[in-house]
Amino acid sequence: MDTKNFYRLDDGSGKYELWIWKGFDEQFEKVTKGDTKSRKKILTWIERLSHGIPTQPEKAKVLKGNACKGLSGPVMELKPKPYRVSFICLCNKYILVGTIWRKRANSRDSSEIDKACKLMKELVEMFLKEAGTCC
């Protein structure tokens, strides 16, 4: 399957197909600039998503808020400290990675969560349109 706005980032051996929004790369470069150690950790955590969604709350959790409602599944965050990466599982087959941000100390990040959820809604629509039906 080819898409205009996403690329696949898995070798096909996992439970899920892992799709990355092309805009993620620019965000990743900007947010993690100069943090080589964390960059490697983030990429490793993202690649592992193709084999399963972490169940430990310190590694991943469902994002809550009004902007996160109304999708076919919950928007989640991967938590490679001090960063956060938003993703969603579609049709129990695809994992779509959307945004990255740096967690601020003592912050609930509600504005970042709202931005992530709003963008994920757009990305899900875009992905399903480009990929066709997913189920």
From Swiss-Prot:
Domain of life of the source: Bacteria
Protein name listed in UniProt: Uncharacterized protein aq_1017
Species of origin: Aquifex aeolicus (strain VF5)
Source species taxonomy: Bacteria, Pseudomonadati, Aquificota, Aquificia, Aquificales
